[in-house]
Amino acid sequence: MALTSFLPAPTQLSQDQLEAEEKARSQRSRQTSLVSSRREPPPYGYRKGWIPRLLEDFGDGGAFPEIHVAQYPLDMGRKKKMSNALAIQVDSEGKIKYDAIARQGQSKDKVIYSKYTDLVPKEVMNADDPDLQRPDEEAIKEITEKTRVALEKSVSQKVAAAMPVRAADKLAPAQYIRYTPSQQGVAFNSGAKQRVIRMVEMQKDPMEPPRFKINKKIPRGPPSPPAPVMHSPSRKVTVKEQQEWKIPPCISNWKNAKGYTIPLDKRLAADGRGLQTVHINENFAKLAEALYIADRKAREAVEMRAQVERKMAQKEKEKHEEKLREMAQKARERRAGIKTHVEKEDGEARERDEIRHDRRKERQHDRNLSRAAPDKRSKLQRNENRDISEVIALGVPNPRTSNEVQYDQRLFNQSKGMDSGFAGGEDEIYNVYDQAWRGGKDMAQSIYRPSKNLDKDMYGDDLEARIKTNRFVPDKEFSGSDRRQRGREGPVQFEEDPFGLDKFLEEAKQHGGSKRPSDSSRPKEHEHEGKKRRKE
C-alpha cells in the first residue's frame, strides 16, 4: 500500500493541479457548447437607442460616431484605477526579484539585503589580492582631505542657502586661450595669424531663483512594522479584575472645588502613605528588651523586698512574743514571791550587749565607707563629725508649720477703706475714695508733654520762640477781620441764607444736572425761606 493512502486529502491544490483542472474545464465547455456566444454590434441603420458599454459591443472596430455617448473602445481614454500592486520584475537569470517589495518607497541607492547569499560571508580565495589590502598612509590622507573639502563645501552651501542675505559667489579666475584660425590670410582675422582670448565667468545674480528642478520626488517609505501580538487570547474580565483596574480620582489635600465628601480611607490612599515601606529601627527592639528586663528586675526586687519585710515582721513578732512571755513569767514569779538574784547580772550583760552592738555598727559603717565611691566617701567623712549648727541655712525662714491661721494686724482697726463699711453703712453716698488721685493735678500737664531740654540740642535756645510763633497766618489780613479775638462764647449763631445757595443746590439735586430749572420748582421758594446757614 502506498503512503498517500494513509494521508488525509489536501485542502488546497497546487499551481500545477489548478492549471490542469482549468484546462480540463475549458475542454469540457468547448465540447459541450453547441452555439458560440459571440456578441457583435447591430448593423448600420439599426443602432437607434443602442449604447455600447462593453468591449464586445465594439467588435473589432472603433467607436461609433453617430452615437453621442462617451465610448472607450479597447479601454482607450478610460482612467485607469489606482493600485498599489507592484509589477513583477525579473533579473538577468529570469528569476522574480522579490526584493522589489522591500525597495518600495526607498531610494535607489539604498542597499537592501534580501537574499540568502547576502548573509553568507564571502570566501577569500587570494589573500594577496590588491583589492583586499589596506590602503597606505598617503592614500588615507588623500581620501581624508577630499572628504573634508567635500563636507566643507556641502556645509557652506547649506549655511549660505539658509541665510536671508548672502554675498555673491566668487568668480573663477580668468582663463587665457591661444586661438589659431583655420583660414589664414590678410582678408581673414584682420591679418592676424593667432589671437589670445581671455575667458571670464559671467557674473551670477544672487537673487535669481533656481532655473531647473533638481529635486526628485521619492515615494513615501513604508510605515513601521506592526507590533507583534504576544499576549494570550482575550478572556472575560472578572469582577475582581475590574475592581483592581479602577483608578481612584485625584484627591487634593488643599482644594475641593466641588465640595465632595471624601472618605478618610480614600484620602489616605490618595496620600500614598500606605505605599511607603516602613523601616523600623533596631533600637526599638533594644529599647523594648531593656524595658522588659528592667520591669522583670523591678518585679524581682519588689518580691525580694516583700520577702525581707515579711521575715523582719516575723522576727519582730517572735521577739514581741518572747518579750511578752518573759513579762508573763516575771509576773507569775512576782506573784509567787520568788526573788530573782540575777537582775543585777542581767543589767550588766545588757549594757555589754549595747556596747557590743554600737561597736558592730561602727565597724559596719567603716566597711561601707571603704567600699563607697571616692566622692561619696569624702562627703560622708566630712559630714561625720560636723556640728549641727553648721547644717542650719542662714537667711532662710524657719519652715516650721503651724496649724493656726496668721493675719496681718495692720489691716485691722482702720477708719478708712473697705473695712470702714462705706461711710458708716450709707451705701447711697459714693465716697469710696477719700481724696483725688495725684492730688487733683491736671493730667494734661503731665501726659504728652515733652521736657523742655528734650529738643534743645536740635533747635537751640529759641525753642520757646518758635513754639509761640503764629503759623498758618497770612501776612496781610482782610479788612474787618480780627485775629486777636478768642473762640466763640455761647451757642452757635445762625443767620438766614442771603444769597439763596441752599435753594440753588436743592434745585440742582432735584433736576439731576439740567441746565435750567423747571417752573414746578418755583412755588417751593417759601420752603427755603426757613433755611439757615451756619456761621462760624
Swiss-Prot record:
Which InterPro entries does the record cross-reference, listed alphabetically? SKI-int_prot_SKIP, SKI-int_prot_SKIP_SNW-dom
Coiled-coil features, chain-numbered ranges:
none
Give the region (Disordered) as residue ranges: 1-46, 209-234, 311-386, 469-536
Q: Which GO terms describe its molecular function?
A: nuclear receptor binding; nuclear retinoic acid receptor binding; nuclear vitamin D receptor binding; SMAD binding; transcription coactivator activity; transcription corepressor activity
> Where is the cross-link described as Glycyl lysine isopeptide (Lys-Gly) (interchain with G-Cter in SUMO2)?
23, 81, 97, 115, 122, 141, 158, 170, 193, 240, 258, 286, 339, 344, 416, 441, 452, 509
Looking at the record, which segments are called Interaction with PPIL1?
Answer: 59-79
Chief location category: nucleus
Where does the protein end up?
A: Nucleus
Q: Where is the composition biased (Basic and acidic residues)?
A: 469-489, 503-530
According to the record, the residues making up region (SNW) are 174-339
Task: Cite the entry's keywords alphabetically.
Answer: Acetylation, Isopeptide bond, mRNA processing, mRNA splicing, Nucleus, Phosphoprotein, Spliceosome, Transcription, Transcription regulation, Ubl conjugation
Cited PANTHER family: NUCLEAR PROTEIN SKIP-RELATED
Query: Which protein family is it in?
Result: Belongs to the SNW family.
What is the name of the protein in this document? SNW domain-containing protein 1
Question: What is the protein's species of origin?
Answer: Pongo abelii
Primary gene name: SNW1
